[in-house]
Each structure stands twice: as structure tokens, then as C-alpha cells.
């Protein structure tokens, strides 16, 4: 693999951001990292790039791998020009031309302008151009679509999808994630979960994982009540060979007392997509009375409608198809 992360742990004081996580990224893989705000996405990026330390674990890159890193908040010398910030070899005509082409796509045209005169958004675009110009083997991108308009985002989608690029990125733009990434890593409850598919696949499999967790907790609660009664007895009533059962009880207690909070990762549809009606149907059910019998037309219907997608509804009964459309419109 290009990157192999083994048993990585990071904490701030008493707060553990991630605990003993492991994952790998192979050549040609495009991986998106998602998590709730404040759970450590950018910190994980910084740790992987050795910008921050970590408590334990190993980070192993393939030998001689060239890595390009886009930070969330890049810093520049305010006196240097855009071209100097992007490229140190101004006497190389071919590379200067490439720099100008990429900067133009990102709407940065004055290459002699001092970086200190640029807005924060313009500086982020210069930083993005700087990473792309160097043509690294492995791209590490923290929020690459921040401060980009629709035209720039679509250009960047095409650029990243050309060739066999290897990418690891953090983004809150679900459309960009769908267009570029073929694997999603979720950082949740200090653990990494891997989903080999797009955002819709991630949502479906994550829901399955949460349902299984709820079932496990409920089962543990039932068993916990029984074991708690046993633990409350006098020690002599338990028997002398029950140490293993006591240990198992405390492990069971941890599971039974878990609380599943609303840990849903909410990625945004960037406001630059105005004009496209995008919506999600999640577990929609619809039934009606048909001459005294229950007629089901939708049963846990789940679908994410993507930008520019065109879908037709077919069936045996035209009125039922209309009901489906009406039901979707009512949720608009």
C-alpha cells in the first residue's frame, strides 16, 4: 500500500480522538474521510503528515513516495508572489505554464500579486494549485472544495478523476465525495469504519451497523439484569471459581450502558449547486386502503438522488406511480 496505518492513537489531555485505529490506502484508491465536526478529521490528517505527534501506533508510507498535502488553513509569506508561493523554479517555462493553467482554472490570474493581498479563500486556492502542480504520487486534501464555485469544483472533479491518482481527503461536500471517491472511511466513537462504495452505500451500511449495535445493546441489557442479580449476592453464594464470570460481567456492563447518540454525519450539498433539486429518500413507506385491503406501494424505499440524475418510474398501475411521485413531492 501507499499508506499503512497501524494501531494509531491520539488524545488531547483526557479526550481520546482515535484509539488504536488501523487502515491502509493502496495505489489508485480514492478515499474520503467523514466524521462529525470536532471528532478529529483534520487532526488525523496532521498526524499522518507528521505535523502533530501521537501517543502510539505506526504510520508507514511506501519508500520514496511523493506526497502532496493541502492543509485546512495554509500559511504563506505575505511578501512572496503567487507564482513564488506555487513554484520555486520560475525559470522552467514548462512548469510555469502548467502553474498558470491550473491557477487560471482556480480563478487566480495575477501571478505577481503578493500573497498578503489575497483573501483567505484565494490563498486556499493557491495552496490547492501548489499541491496539484507538483504532481505528487499521493494527494492528501483537507477540504479541497472550500472557497470553490461550481465551475471550479467541476474542473477539480475532472482533474482528480483523470489517470490513476491516489487520494485521501476530508470533505463535507457529499456530491464531490460521490463523484471522486470509491471508498469512505468513517471516524466514529474513536474508531475507523471502512465502506467500499459511494456515499449512498455508506449511508445504507452505516444504518445497518447502527441497527446491529442497538440490537447488541438491548441483548446485553437483558443479560446484564440477570448477571447483576448474581453479582449482588454475597461472595460465598457465588462460588469460588467465578472470577471469569465477574470479569465478563464488567465487560457486559460497558456494552449495556452504551448510549447511542445522534452521531449521524451530515454532509452538505454545497450552495453552489443552486438550481438542482437534490433530495434523499430514507426508509419511506406508503400504503393506502384499496377496497378494504391494505395496498403497499413503498416499503422502506431508500434512494439518494444525485445532481443531474434523471429517473423514471414504471409499474403495473399508473395511479400507483402517481402516488409515488406525489409522496416524494410531499417530502420536498
Please state what every model-predicted region is.
Residues 206-238, 242-248, 252-258:
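Intracellular alpha-helical coupling/juxtamembrane segments of multi-pass membrane proteins
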Residues 1-217, 267-323, 329:
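ABC ATP-binding cassette signature C-motif
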Amino acid at each position: 500500500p501507499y499508506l499503512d496505518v497501524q494501531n494509531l492513537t491520539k488524545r488531547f489531555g483526557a479526550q481520546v480522538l482515535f484509539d488504536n485505529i488501523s487502515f491502509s490506502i493502496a495505489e489508485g484508491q480514492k478515499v474520503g474521510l467523514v466524521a462529525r465536526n470536532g471528532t478529529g478529521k483534520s487532526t488525523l490528517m496532521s498526524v499522518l503528515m507528521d505535523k502533530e505527534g501521537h501517543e502510539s501506533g505506526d504510520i508507514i508510507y511506501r519508500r520514496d513516495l511523493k506526497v502532496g498535502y493541502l492543509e485546512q488553513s495554509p500559511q504563506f509569506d505575505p511578501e512572496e508572489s503567487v507564482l513564488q508561493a506555487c513554484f520555486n523554479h520560475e525559470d522552467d517555462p514548462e512548469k510555469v505554464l502548467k502553474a498558470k493553467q491550473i491557477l487560471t482554472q482556480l480563478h487566480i490570474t495575477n501571478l505577481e500579486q503578493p500573497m498578503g493581498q489575497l483573501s483567505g479563500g484565494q490563498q486556499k486556492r493557491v495552496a490547492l494549485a501548489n499541491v496539484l502542480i507538483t504532481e505528487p504520487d499521493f494527494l492528501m486534501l483537507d477540504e479541497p472544495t472550500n472557497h470553490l464555485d461550481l465551475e471550479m469544483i467541476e474542473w477539480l472533479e475532472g482533474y482528480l478523476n483523470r489517470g490513476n491518482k491516489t487520494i485521501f481527503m476530508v470533505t463535507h461536500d457529499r456530491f464531490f465525495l460521490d463523484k471522486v471517491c470509491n471508498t469512505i472511511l468513517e471516524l466514529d466513537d474513536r474508531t475507523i469504519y471502512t465502506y467500499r462504495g459511494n456515499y449512498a452505500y455508506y449511508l445504507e451500511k452505516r444504518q445497518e451497523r447502527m441497527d446491529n449495535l442497538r440490537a447488541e445493546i438491548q441483548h446485553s441489557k437483558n443479560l446484564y439484569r440477570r448477571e447483576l442479580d448474581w453479582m449482588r449476592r454475597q461472595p460465598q453464594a457465588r462460588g469460588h471459581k467465578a472470577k471469569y464470570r465477574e470479569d465478563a460481567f464488567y465487560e457486559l456492563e460497558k456494552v449495556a450502558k452504551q448510549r447511542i447518540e445522534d452521531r449521524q454525519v451530515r454532509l452538505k450539498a454545497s450552495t453552489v449547486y443552486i438550481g438542482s433539486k437534490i433530495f434523499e429518500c430514507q426508509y419511506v413507506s406508503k400504503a393506502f386502503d384499496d377496497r378494504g385491503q391494505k395496498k403497499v406501494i413503498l416499503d422502506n424505499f431508500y434512494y439518494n438522488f444525485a445532481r443531474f440524475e434523471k429517473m423514471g418510474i414504471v409499474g403495473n398501475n399508473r395511479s400507483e406511480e402517481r402516488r409515488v411521485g406525489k409522496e416524494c413531492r410531499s417530502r420536498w
